[in-house]
């Protein structure tokens, strides 16, 4: 059955891997939101399976108006429903000392990583409820094990990033409780080999942290694993915080 999938932050890293993975699935319309569609030639050149197509939409996740406008433009492309939304856009990086970090730094992470997916959910909810796939629509928030209070002792100093992901997890849990007609969960993709992750790793090393044991998966591998979880999603997954292998993570 034809499917419509929306992925934020689709121009690089895991987002691009997700776009490529869904475009390789027949009869799939992929809506990739990006900050500047004119600079996404590599996305447009991705291989497409029979019946699949790509729509690039400009969206800035820190702006409620931008999110509302972007979702509003879908009607002009005859898109009246969405089956899967993956809130992938985000920022990451270490914070050397939370006590010394300005509130503005913490707010920047929260605006992108927590409030962004929250505002996106509100904007796409009518389209998710209009899904005619025969199954419940899905909203997946790409989170991080760094947002787990139980796991924070094993991480490099990512207090601002971790706090924003912990807030995102809380919002996802509450949205799932409020909207039982949609399957909603927070998804840890694992350690994905992206430019953003490498930049954070280099900075952490410069601060003296030994991360030699850390291993990465490719964006494509991670995207395939996430798609497999989405394809098999059940109502029981809603409101949970899942690891890359589908096991449940502690909040």
From Swiss-Prot:
Pathway: Secondary metabolite biosynthesis; terpenoid biosynthesis
Catalytic residues (UniProt): 143 (proton donor), 161 (proton donor), 165 (lowers pka of active site tyr)
Domain of life of the organism encoding this protein: Eukaryota
Enzyme Commission numbers on file: 1.-.-.-
UniProt record, GO biological process: terpenoid biosynthetic process
UniProtKB keywords: NADP, Nucleotide-binding, Oxidoreductase
Technological use: Griseofulvin is a spirocyclic fungal natural product used in treatment of fungal dermatophytes.
One Pfam match: adh_short
Residues binding NADP(+): 14, 33, 60, 88, 122, 161, 165, 192, 194
One CC-aspect GO term: cytoplasm
MF (Gene Ontology): nucleotide binding; oxidoreductase activity
Record's keyword annotation contains Oxidoreductase: yes
Family from the record: Belongs to the short-chain dehydrogenases/reductases (SDR) family.
Stated role: Short chain dehydrogenase; part of the gene cluster that mediates the biosynthesis of griseofulvin, an important antifungal drug that has been in use for a long time for treating dermatophyte infections. The first step of the pathway is the formation of the heptaketide backbone by gsfA which is initiated by priming with acetyl-CoA, followed by sequential condensations of 6 malonyl-CoA units. The resulting benzophenone can undergo a spontaneous dehydration to form norlichexanthone.
Database matches in PANTHER family: NADB-LER2, SHORT-CHAIN DEHYDROGENASE/REDUCTASE
Protein name per the record: Short chain dehydrogenase gsfK
Protein source organism: Penicillium aethiopicum
Lineage, uppermost ranks: Eukaryota, Fungi, Dikarya, Ascomycota, Pezizomycotina
